[in-house]
Regions:
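Bacterial N-terminal signal peptides that target proteins for export
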Residues: 2-10
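Terminal presequence/propeptide segments associated with secretion/organelle targeting
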Residues: 20-569
Length: 569
C-alpha cells in the first residue's frame, strides 16, 4: 500500500464525520492485537507498529467517549453531544452557549472547563499471566476474584508510581485476558468552538441513531499542559480530497460495551430483567424532564442536557432490546452456543475443564434476577437521583476506604483513582436545585414503592411525602459548595462521620445495605461470570484460535471498513 493511501487511512476519524457511508467489518480490535492476517488478505494492508502508535497517540478519551488530536498544538475534535456537558457547565443564564454556540477567535478567549480531564493511551501490556497466576484450583469463584483484585490493585499502584501515569488493568474476554493500560491525564482543557444546539442536534431525538443524519455534531477543545498548548507530533490531518469508493477506512475510538461473547442465559437476563426495568425507568424520567422543561426559562435550559442523555440512552437500549426480542436473532445465538458446547463435549479433556461453564453462568443469572432491583436502587443509586447524593456517597466511602490497605478497598477508591476523585469533588460546577429536587422526588417515589417496608426507607420518609423529603435534603445540604467538599476531603473519616449534613447522613444510612447487595453481586454473580466466562474464552481459543476481537470495554479499539455507496429509500 502506498504512502498516500496510508495517509488517507490516518485521517479516517475525521473523514467519517463528513463522508459517505462506511461498511464496517466485524470486530472492535485491540491496538496490541490487530487482525493483521485479515487486513492483509482483504485490503493488502498490514499496519506497522509505528502506524499503530501514531493512531493510538492521536486518539483521546473524553470521559466515556472519543476524540482525536487534529493539530500539533493540542487542538482536539469530538462530537458536540460528547462536549455538551462541558458546554453546559460553561453556560450561565446570561450566556447560554448551547443556544448561541461559541467560537474563540484567539487562544486568550478559550474557556477553561472546570473538572474535565481527558486521557491519552501511552502503552498496553499483556499482564494475563500475573493476574491469573494468583488463582488456585481449590479457590471458589469469589476467592479467586478477591485474589485477582488484590493483584490488580498492587500492579496498578506499582505502575502508577513507577511511570507517573494512570494505570488500569482491563478485563478482556470475560476474564480470559488482562491488559495493563497506561494513560497520560490532561486536566487543563479549554473550549475553542461549538455550534449552537439546533445545528449540532438538527433533527432532534427522531433523527438520533439514524443514517443518514444531517447535523454538525462536532466541537473543538484545546488541551494545555503547564499553561501552554499541549504539543504533540501525533494528530490526524485533514483530508481535503475525501475518500473514494472502496478505500479502506480505519476508525479509532472507545466503544462503550458490546455483548457478542455473552452466553444465551446472560442475554435472556438482559431481555427479561435488566432492559425492561431500564426502559421503564428511562421512559418515566424522560416524561418527567419534558414536564419540568415546560416551566420554561432556566428550567428548560438546565433540563436540556439530562433530557438529551436520557433520550439518547432510551433509544440505544430500545435498539438492544429489539434485537433480543427478535426470535430469529436469539435462535442464531442459541445455535452458535449449542455448536460450541457440542464441540467442547466431543473432547473429554476440554469438556472436563470447560463444559460446566455455561450452567454456572446460568445459575448466576437467577441470583442476579433476585437482587437486581435492590442493586440498582441502592448500590446503583437509582433510589437517590441527585448529584448531591453522589457527592455524599463518594465522601462517605472515601473516608471509610482510605484508611484501608489499597488492595482491600472498593476498587474505585484505590490510590490510582484518588487524584481524579479529588479534582471532581473540588471543581466548581453548577448545580440547579429545582431540578435536583424534581429528580430526587421522582426517584424517592419509586424507592418507596419498591422498598417502603425496609427500616432504612421508613426512617428516611418518617411519614412524609417524597417531595417533602427531597426538599428537606436539598435545602439542608451544603455539598454544593466546593469549599465544604474540600473541608470534608481534608477532614477525612472524623469529619465525615461527625457530619450533620442531611445528605451525608443519608449516605451513611444506606451504605451498609448498599455494600451488602454489592458484596452478594460480586461474590455470587460477577465472580462467577468472570471465572466461567474466562473458561469459555479459553475453550474458544483452543477450538478456534485467538483471531477473535473481545467485546468492547470502553477502552481504545480499532474498526475497519470500506467506503461504499448505497441506494437511499
Amino acid at each position: 500500500m502506498n504512502k498516500t493511501r496510508v495517509r488517507n487511512i490516518w485521517t479516517g476519524l475525521l473523514v467519517l464525520v463528513l463522508a459517505g457511508p462506511v461498511l464496517a467489518d466485524e470486530g472492535l480490535w485491540l491496538f496490541n492485537m490487530p487482525p493483521a492476517e485479515i487486513l492483509k488478505a482483504k485490503y493488502n494492508f498490514v499496519p506497522s507498529p509505528e502506524w499503530l502508535d501514531h493512531l493510538r497517540l492521536s486518539s483521546i478519551r473524553f470521559g466515556g467517549a472519543s476524540g482525536s488530536f487534529v493539530s500539533p498544538d493540542g487542538l482536539a475534535l469530538t462530537n458536540h453531544h460528547v462536549g455538551q456537558g462541558a458546554i453546559q457547565r460553561l453556560s450561565t443564564p446570561e450566556r447560554d452557549l448551547m443556544k448561541t454556540g461559541f467560537y474563540a477567535r484567539t487562544r486568550a478567549e478559550e474557556l477553561k472547563v472546570p473538572g474535565l480531564e481527558l486521557s491519552v493511551l501511552q502503552s498496553i501490556e499483556d499482564v494475563t499471566a500475573r493476574i491469573k497466576g494468583v488463582e488456585r484450583p481449590e479457590m471458589t469463584a469469589a476467592e479467586a476474584a478477591e485474589a485477582r483484585d488484590r493483584e490488580i490493585a498492587a500492579l496498578e499502584e506499582e505502575e502508577s508510581e513507577k511511570t507517573g501515569l494512570r494505570c488500569a488493568v482491563v478485563n478482556l474476554f470475560s476474564g480470559g485476558m488482562y491488559h495493563l493500560y497506561r494513560y497520560k491525564i490532561i486536566t487543563d482543557v479549554r473550549l475553542v468552538f461549538a455550534p449552537d444546539y439546533l445545528i449540532a442536534f438538527f433533527g432532534g431525538d427522531q433523527d438520533n441513531f439514524t443514517y443518514p443524519r444531517y447535523d454538525l455534531d462536532i466541537c473543538l477543545f484545546r488541551l494545555y499542559e503547564n499553561d501552554r498548548p499541549y504539543p504533540t507530533p501525533h494528530y490526524l490531518k485533514w483530508n481535503t480530497s475525501g475518500q473514494k469508493e472502496g478505500d479502506l477506512v480505519v476508525v479509532s475510538g472507545h466503544p462503550g460495551s458490546t455483548g457478542r461473547l455473552l452466553t444465551v442465559s446472560q442475554l435472556a437476563f438482559l431481555r427479561d430483567v435488566a432492559y425492561p426495568w431500564t426502559l421503564a425507568n428511562y421512559e418515566r424520567r424522560r416524561a418527567g424532564l419534558q414536564y419540568f422543561s415546560k416551566r420554561g426559562g432556566e428550567a428548560a435550559r438546565n433540563a436540556r442536557g439530562p433530557l438529551f442523555g436520557i433520550e439518547n440512552s432510551l433509544k440505544a437500549v430500545t435498539g438492544y432490546q429489539s434485537g433480543l426480542l427478535d426470535p430469529v436473532l436469539m435462535e442464531i445465538k442459541l445455535k452458535e452456543e449449542t455448536a460450541l458446547r457440542e464441540a467442547v463435549r466431543r473432547d473429554p479433556e476440554i469438556d472436563k475443564l470447560y463444559g460446566a461453564a455455561w450452567d454456572e453462568i446460568a445459575a448466576a443469572q437467577k441470583t442476579y434476577a433476585e437482587i437486581y432491583k435492590m442493586y440498582r436502587y441502592f448500590e446503583g443509586g437509582a433510589g437517590f437521583t441527585t448529584s448531591y447524593f453522589s457527592t455524599a456517597r463518594t465522601l462517605v466511602r472515601l473516608a471509610a476506604e482510605k484508611p484501608k490497605p489499597d488492595a482491600e478497598r472498593l476498587r474505585e477508591y484505590r490510590d490510582v483513582s484518588l487524584p481524579a476523585i479529588t479534582r471532581r469533588l473540588t471543581a466548581e460546577t453548577p448545580v440547579f436545585n429545582d431540578l435536583e429536587v424534581f429528580n430526587l422526588t421522582d426517584s424517592l417515589i419509586q424507592l418507596q414503592k419498591e422498598f417502603g417496608s425496609l427500616p432504612e426507607v421508613k426512617w428516611l420518609f418518617a411519614g412524609r411525602l417524597a417531595e417533602d423529603v427531597a426538599k428537606d435534603l436539598i435545602s439542608g445540604t451544603k455539598l454544593g459548595d466546593p469549599a465544604v467538599r474540600k473541608a470534608y476531603l481534608e477532614g477525612g473519616l472524623q469529619a465525615v462521620s461527625l457530619s450533620v449534613d442531611p445528605m451525608i447522613k443519608l449516605a451513611w444510612l444506606v451504605d451498609p445495605l448498599s455494600r451488602g447487595v454489592r458484596k452478594r453481586y460480586e461474590q455470587e454473580v460477577e465472580s462467577v461470570e468472570t471465572r466461567n466466562g474466562a473458561l469459555i474464552a479459553q475453550a474458544v481459543f483452543k477450538l478456534k484460535g485467538t483471531a477473535v476481537a473481545p467485546d468492547a470495554t470502553g477502552t481504545l479499539r480499532l474498526s475497519f471498513g470500506a467506503v461504499k455507496g448505497y441506494v437511499e429509500n
